[in-house]
Regions:
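Cytosolic, long alpha-helical scaffolding segments
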Residues: 1-244
Length: 244
């Protein structure tokens, strides 16, 4: 191999590494914004903070823009550098992760919109506790899986993947609790229905965190997870919420 050829290979490798570093930085930035969006959306619900709910909604275009930036950068990198094997999986994986983060952000935005819509409605504080607990679990899972993505930690990613059933079970329990409150006092019906949709949004966030775990597995192992994803029993969900 000539010195010129070696120099070109080294230059290409360095350029690809630079591209990957930029992609990784943008994914991390997007992950941080989405984590904040989840926390703020639930806090807005707990505190009846319409202004915070509006800020959650206003953050969504920034997250969408980052998702497009990562996708464009990955496509350009693939076209320019023509990566193979693990390098190609890095680009494909980043696009997948950002797609799931964007969807999580959408679900947080939905909660923000419900906070704004509820405003001065009858708002029993005790009904929100289950949503708080569920969101704390999903937020912890998202943080764990993003750390797993950053460090390519397969075991940590699999722990999140296996934890999806816990989120589903918590959602079912919360639905049953809210149905009980609705039967006890008709004044609770409107607010409980809003909370059911919020809970379903949070459950969907957990599904997307599990998708990210599957992406980490694909990036590390070079193949998809073949086992069936653990899922809780959702037969008690009202049909309208399931279709959301």
């Amino acid at each position: 191999m000539t010195d010129i050829t070696t120099t070109r290979i080294d230059h290409t490798a360095k350029a690809f590494d630079t591209d990957l570093q930029e992609i990784t930085r943008k994914v991390a930035e997007m992950g941080g914004l989405v984590e904040r969006q989840i926390a703020d959306s639930v806090q807005a619900l707990v505190d009846r903070d319409v202004e915070l709910g509006e800020r959650v909604i206003a953050l969504d275009p920034t997250i969408d823009a980052l998702q497009r930036e990562v996708e464009d950068k990955c496509i350009l990198t693939i076209a320019r550098r023509q990566p193979m094997a693990v390098d190609l999986r890095e680009c494909v994986g980043a696009m997948r992760v950002c797609n799931d983060l964007e969807r999580i952000g959408d679900h947080a935005k939905h909660i923000g919109k419900r906070v704004v819509a509820l405003d001065d409605d009858f708002y029993p504080q005790k009904l929100i506790r289950g949503v708080e607990h569920m969101s704390a679990l999903v937020l912890a899972q998202l943080k764990q899986v993003l750390d797993a993505y950053a460090s390519r930690d397969l075991q940590s990613a699999l722990a999140v993947w296996n934890g999806d059933e816990q989120v589903d079970s918590m959602c079912v329990s919360l639905f049953r609790e809210l149905l009980t409150y609705m039967m006890e006092d008709p004044r609770n019906i409107t607010f409980c229905m809003h909370l059911m949709f919020c809970a379903k949004d949070i459950e969907r966030m957990g599904d997307h965190a599990t998708n990210i775990a599957e992406t980490v597995y694909y990036m590390v192992e070079g193949r998809p997870i073949t086992d069936q994803r653990p899922k809780g029993d959702t037969t008690s969900f009202p049909a309208g919420v399931l279709q959301k």
